[in-house]
């Protein structure tokens, strides 16, 4: 069973960072200095566990353009088990409760675009490349 919590302890934050390290740096070859950034201290972080094992992470932060969802990561062995869906639902629930009038957006990696479309996001603008990975900006329409 999947459980998603808002990170409140250093231990949970370390677990989220470890998941991001495995997915983005090791698996996708994103430079480590690009994966961790200056927004870590202001972002709201989330950690997913599956049967008690940390397996997914995400964060969101306020920007001048609205609320940006970022760093969604699920370990390979836990994909296709609705972990990503549970993280997204938890994050959206918190974001919409705290910021009902703000636009919610994210930059989706190409393989994840259809996942986000199924959950109420629409593409905006042209495809772009960040850290050698193709992305689309997507806006939450609900």
Model-derived features with residue positions:
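Short amphipathic alpha-helix that is part of the acyltransferase structural core
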Residues: 1-45, 49-51
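Conserved acetyl-CoA pyrophosphate-binding loop and the N-cap/start of the following alpha-helix
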Residues: 78, 82-90
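Conserved acetyl-CoA-binding loop of GNAT-fold acetyltransferases
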Residues: 117-127
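C-terminal "cap" of GNAT-fold acetyltransferases
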Residues: 109, 129-142
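Conserved beta-strand in the GNAT
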Residues: 47, 53-61, 68-73
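Short acidic/glycine-enriched loop/turn segments that link adjacent beta-strands
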Residues: 40-42, 65, 130-134
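Conserved GNAT acetyl-CoA-binding A-motif
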Residues: 95-108
